[in-house]
């Protein structure tokens, strides 16, 4: 029950590309992004940093690094457009910055799908203080 409450709090005030990211993750993995990845490992979710605990967590680490390279827009708030064509994500954004955000989100969604075999339910709620020092991007 407590986990559901935490997830509900994380959803408050969500806007912009996070919604698109969550849709992409569901389309690629079949898993609800917030429930399955919102607190996963040491890198998935808001404010988490640390040495990745597995390949799934590394996807989130690489995604955060990708967002750090984005300039000219806010990756977490500004909305972009994409489509789902023949079971593939197609970033259709004309704005170069928003296209870059879309490509970052597409990459993490595909990475999570490719690493479904490393997904460990024991890492679904990892407490931040248990994480080791983060790597640099």
Curated annotation (Swiss-Prot):
GO MF assignments: calcium ion binding; calcium-dependent phospholipase A2 activity; phospholipid binding; toxin activity
InterPro entries (alphabetical): PLipase_A2 (IPR001211), PLipase_A2_Asp_AS (IPR033112), PLipase_A2_dom (IPR016090), PLipase_A2_dom_sf (IPR036444), PLipase_A2_His_AS (IPR033113)
Catalytic reaction equation(s): a 1,2-diacyl-sn-glycero-3-phosphocholine + H2O = a 1-acyl-sn-glycero-3-phosphocholine + a fatty acid + H(+)
PROSITE patterns: PA2_ASP, PA2_HIS
Signal sequence residues: 1-16
One of the GO BP terms on file: phospholipid metabolic process
Function according to Swiss-Prot or TrEMBL: Snake venom phospholipases A2 that have myotoxic, and edema-inducing activity, as well as extremely weak lipolytic activity. PLA2 catalyzes the calcium-dependent hydrolysis of the 2-acyl groups in 3-sn-phosphoglycerides.
UniProt enzyme class: hydrolase
Ribonucleoprotein is among the record's keywords: no
Alphabetized UniProt keyword annotations: Disulfide bond, Hydrolase, Myotoxin, Secreted, Signal, Toxin
Superkingdom classification of source: Eukaryota
Biological source species: Protobothrops elegans (Elegant pitviper)
Protein name listed in UniProt: Basic phospholipase A2 PeBP(R)-I/II
Location(s) in or outside the cell: Secreted
Gene Ontology CC annotations of this record: extracellular region
EC identifiers of the protein: 3.1.1.4
Main location: secreted
Active site: 63, 105
Covalent S-S links between cysteines: 42-131, 44-60, 59-111, 65-137, 66-104, 73-97, 91-102
Family: Belongs to the phospholipase A2 family. Group II subfamily. R49 sub-subfamily.
Stated consequence of mutating residue 19 to I: In PeBP(R)-II
Misc remark: The sequence shown is that of PeBP(R)-I. PeBP(R)-II differs at two positions. Negative results: does not show hemorrhagic activity.
Expression sites (tissue/organ): Expressed by the venom gland.
